[in-house]
Amino acid sequence: MAASSAAFAACLLACALLFQMCVASRKLTALVQDQPITMTYHKGALLSGRIAVNLIWYGNFSAPQRAVITDFVSSLSTPPSPQPQPEPSVASWFKTAQKYYANSKARFPALSLGQHVLDQSYSLGKRLGEKDLVRLAARGSPSRAINVVLTADDVAVDGFCMSRCGTHGASPRSRAGRFAYVWVGNPATQCPGQCAWPYHQPVYGPQAAPLTPPNGDVGVDGMVISLASMIVGTVTNPFGNGFFQGDADAPLEAATACAGVYGKGAYPGYAGSLLVDPASGASYNANGAHGRKYLVPALVDPDTSACSTVG
């Protein structure tokens, strides 16, 4: 979810009539805060225990594109020895979210890669609304799951690029259980300046040269940033009454409150001090599974009430 007015920073909570879900969106405005950021717990339920992250691929994704995102999801958990992720790692970054559970009765969820669902026939068409995203999310597990809908670069989704790069929400309670869901779109052809910064020049603000993406794909590396933000939002505010700042209709969550911040010294138009791969020249801040490198957003550390970057 770019520079001062195009990098992502607020959240939006909307209620769909049919599904009654709470949706938080990674929007397109940047926010670099110097003041303390307090995430208030609103006493709602949190995810707990073992949670499968199921990936629903809508439209055409190449095998290498799917591998980048699949490996990112696998990176969220700390692998057993002898193959730990080099530090700074995606797993260590994700552990910052665990601090939100310190005073909760819930046990911090253990995320694991679940099933893959492929829809390369565009069964719902190439223009999707909120209800369509929910229908797609329902193709994953009905309970103890985060069902992630990933739309290809030729799929138009209501609000995509204009106000958001991704959303998260939850299904209503049912006998089958309840699942959380995430949607993220590939911005490669529609809005890389909004939803793939700093790997593409922003639409607005300072026009610094874009950074080189670590996986060689501007759109998919941008999707990883949005997916990371939305998964943390799902873990800390799954049902709209968890941890957030501000009004429930437009909450700021652990990642979206730090939009546009990826390294120390970040300011609007500058992502911050990042690691650079000497072989490829790619910029990143976290190591992942299978030797992958990723860019993940800063998170609000509840112990310091400030945006915390990796490393």
UniProtKB/Swiss-Prot annotation:
For this protein, the record's InterPro entries field holds: EXORDIUM-like (IPR006766)
Q: Which domain of life is it from?
A: Eukaryota
Q: Which residues form the signal peptide?
A: 1-24
Q: Where in the cell is it found?
A: Secreted; Secreted, Extracellular space; Secreted, Extracellular space, Apoplast
Glycosylated residue positions: N60
Sorted UniProt keywords: Apoplast, Glycoprotein, Secreted, Signal
- Which tissues does the record link to its expression? Expressed in leaf sheaths and nodes.
What's one GO-annotated cellular component?
apoplast
One Pfam annotation, family name?
Phi_1
Its function, per the record, reads:
Involved in the control of organ size. Upon auxin signaling, is targeted by the transcription activator SMOS1 to regulate cell expansion during organ size control. May promote cell expansion by modulating microtubule organization.
Extra notes?
A: Plants silencing PHI-1 exhibit partial dwarfism due to decreased cell size, increased cell number, and abnormal cell arrangement and microtubule orientation.
Protein family according to the UniProt entry: Belongs to the EXORDIUM family.
UniProt name for this protein: Protein PHOSPHATE-INDUCED 1 homolog
Recorded source organism is: Oryza sativa subsp. japonica (Rice)
